[in-house]
UniProtKB/Swiss-Prot annotation:
Gene: PGA5
UniProtKB keywords: Cell membrane, Cell wall biogenesis/degradation, Disulfide bond, Glycoprotein, GPI-anchor, Lipoprotein, Membrane, Signal, Transferase
PANTHER family: 1,3-BETA-GLUCANOSYLTRANSFERASE GAS1, 1,3-BETA-GLUCANOSYLTRANSFERASE GAS2
Ranges annotated as biased composition (Polar residues): 596-610
Listed EC numbers: 2.4.1.-
Family designation: Belongs to the glycosyl hydrolase 72 family.
Disulfide bond entries: C106-C135, C248-C390, C276-C307, C424-C474, C426-C528, C433-C498, C451-C456
Stated name of the protein: 1,3-beta-glucanosyltransferase PGA5
One GO-annotated biological process of the protein: ascospore wall assembly
Keyword Signal among UniProt keywords: yes
Binding residue positions for (1,3-beta-D-glucosyl)n 2: E193, D234, R239
Amino acid sequence: MTTLSTIWLFLITITAIFQLGLSSNVTTIIDDDNNNNNNNNNNADDFLEPQIETIKVIGNKFFECESGHQFFIKGIAYQKTRQEGEIYDTTKEPHYIDPLANPFTCLRDLDYLKELGINLVRVYQIHPNANHDVCMNAFAEAGIYVLADLSEPTISIRRDYPHWDTEIFNRYQQVIDSMSNYKNLLGFFAGNEVTNCQSNIDASPFVRAAIRDCKKYINQQGYRKIPIGYASNDDANIRKNLANYFVCQLDEDEDKGQEHLNSQADFFAINVYEWCGYSTYTTSGYRDLTTMFKDYSVPVFFSEFGCNIITPRPFTEVEAIYGSTMKKVWSGGIAYEYFEEVNHYGILLTKKDGSITKLPDFDTLKMRFHAATPIGITMDEATICEPPICSNSVIDDKSSSSSSSSSFWDVALTLPPTPNEAKCECLWQSLSCVVSEDATFDEEVALRELCFKVDCEDINANGRSGKYGRYSDCNPTVRTSYALNKYYEQCGKKQEICDFQGRGELLPNRNGGLQDLENKFSSDGQNCLSLLEGKEEEKEVQEEEPDVPGLPGSNKGKEVESTPKRKGKGKSKEKEKGKLIEEEEEEEEEEEENNKTPSSGEKSPKTSKSIAGGNAITFKNDSIWKTFIEILFTCSAAILI
């Protein structure tokens, strides 16, 4: 009896241990599943896209895409500038400050921006290689949109020496690539006060060309339709002319027949400082502006406002801008500005330790913005206004008193061509005497000097006559090198001529001229000889890599890619898209296979891993357990017998 009791006790103990182990493992599996689910939920929250509606243009109004409500801009200029003598790492940072690339400052400022009651910030300088995810997503969560300028101080269309070239276009493309995926990006400015008086109205065709080519680029990259417009100064002599010019329809716009590919501005903005102190709708000139734009075909708003002749500023113009009369014409405005600078327009002061102090203007502007609650029309009520055909009489608009001083709009209705980097790469390869890589000088000054000595028709661009040289779209270094090489050849290829007072150099293995280009190609595979002769024939891709030296940039120390277009993150070249899609589909199938519920007779990979990793006694399968029990019972029976 004692032996039998011992055997049965042994069997019960083994069974209990097994059940305890199985129970422990089941508990472990459940805990692991719960932890994994929690982790998955946390990861989903981390990558959850901010719920903010994109803004679109219909007629002369902005609208929220999903709700269909009219959108009024209540914004502030958000741009910090470097102080004189400021020390920073030039190898890692540009010479300007991108306020959306610094999470510390933008998250610090976010509470103040929300308190202010704004729904948009204007950023004048974007660093295209920086990551903007933290700031842009945080702003989106707070319901704040962004209007970004495409230019930066050293790469922009100059009013005194305008060109639309490869360097500027590359810059614009990079900014578009870096910002286009954010839903709270309202749009881009292609220029800011490029034309600011009658003497430089010939710079405006270059801005329209920029609008045209950026729209085309956005379409080619498959981005959503992002509005692109222009910010003008408030010169009473030309503001109506400029407004008419940027929205009228050119012949080339009619040929395209597609709104998203034309050169017309999607919106027009004005930097207005007419309302000072406790002015009025009439005395400030706001009434005249509103009358001027009452039938305008695209949205119009104040890209800057906030006269500071009287301080602290009462910002009484805010009530008028969003009032019953002006809201029918204007889509709001952007107060100038957030950061206190040397010009004393700021509403907050940044201290050296990074802390913020409110200035008196902050609370006043906050009060005005919170009191402004305009209600506009719905998307269904929007009216599409057909823009007029461009002509000097239409642009002059003699019915406007502000343009009476202008005899005529003496600017050609022909725009500069789209910059062709492949052509400029090939031109560079044809030159033997070029601007020295180590030289530091103003390209414009050098060109003025050289063009007194040689004919520069091929690199000149004239917005008044509408004549654009075949190489006028190349960057300043290539244009200057072209003129220097021409002078060098004209003077018998004397080395001292190429030296150009220490600013030029001879490149080895360059004979110069077109005869050297038959076996050279641009970075996109075009034959250089055909390209420069105007044939622009495509060359089949050869097994050997084409000889493509990098295209120089006009800013020394700045890396300039030789490819005609620079892709942004998240976007692949057309030839890579198919491969990427296949890889993504394979990854999705593999993920589904791993996460699917196991069918009868199968074991979940996750369950197997959890059991194997437990501390309790485990068995690989049920057959081993059954065999073990049978052996125990057999031994028990033998002992009893």
